């Protein structure tokens, strides 16, 4: 009877480990790469108007005015729209809403809602985020909204058109945000029901807290 060749268990274990751990290593690497991509990678400043920007950036008054003007135009294009003043005020508070012409691209059923006045209602732009003014390039900007109704999830917060919050509505702050935060938002093509924007803010806040918790857990596991 032939003797069975002696198995090199050490070599076997190494081979098995390398073969089976490689995918895990790749997965871990992918996670860290994704985490790196999601890190805050752009510094922005929060201003209420062009004067605030000019005061913080001496000699850049023209650029500040242009950025503010562009932010206002972007707000008109992307802000939540309401069929009635009452719906907007219920969300953002008294004195925080303005009429805006019914724009092209709005769904026909929503256009019909505004036929009597020829316009919708939208929140006033409370401030805007602006990227750094560097060289001769024009800085990006993103309009921000805020509610003065204590019952709204957006109360006292700076939020963009998607409902994502950027903290307390206090101009003059500088913060780091993902580059995606400065990307243009889609134009508003439907009206929002009363309380609808607040729901979006609440959902976004929940997602942000969940993401922050996951990041914290990952760091804890990593030691």
UniProtKB/Swiss-Prot annotation:
User: From start to end residue, where is composition biased (Low complexity)?
Assistant: 177-193, 209-223
Q: Which Pfam families match?
A: DUF1190 (PF06693)
Q: Where is this region: Disordered?
A: 165-223
Q: Which family does it belong to?
A: Belongs to the UPF0441 family.
The family database entries (NCBIfam families) matched by this protein are listed as: PRK11653.1
Name recorded for this polypeptide: UPF0441 protein KPK_0672
Organism from which the protein derives:
Klebsiella pneumoniae (strain 342)
């Amino acid at each position: 009877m032939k003797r069975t060749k002696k198995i090199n268990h050490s070599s076997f274990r190494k081979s098995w480990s390398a073969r089976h751990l490689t995918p895990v290593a790749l997965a871990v690497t992918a996670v860290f790469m994704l985490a790196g991509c999601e890190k805050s990678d752009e510094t922005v400043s929060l201003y209420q108007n062009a004067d605030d920007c000019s005061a913080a950036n001496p000699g850049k008054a023209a650029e500040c005015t242009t950025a503010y003007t562009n932010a206002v135009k972007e707000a008109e294009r992307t802000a939540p729209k309401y069929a009635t003043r009452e719906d907007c005020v219920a969300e953002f508070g008294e004195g925080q809403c303005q009429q805006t012409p019914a724009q092209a691209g709005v769904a026909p059923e929503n256009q019909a809602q505004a036929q009597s006045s020829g316009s919708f209602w939208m929140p006033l732009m409370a401030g805007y985020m602006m990227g750094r003014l560097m060289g001769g390039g024009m800085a990006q900007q993103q309009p921000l909204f805020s509610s003065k109704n204590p019952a709204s999830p957006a109360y006292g917060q700076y939020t963009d058109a998607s409902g994502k919050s950027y903290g307390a509505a206090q101009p003059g702050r500088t913060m780091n945000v993902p580059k995606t935060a400065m990307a243009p938002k889609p134009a508003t093509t439907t009206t929002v029901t009363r309380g609808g924007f607040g729901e979006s803010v609440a959902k976004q806040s929940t997602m942000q807290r969940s993401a922050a918790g996951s990041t914290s857990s990952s760091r804890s596991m990593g030691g």
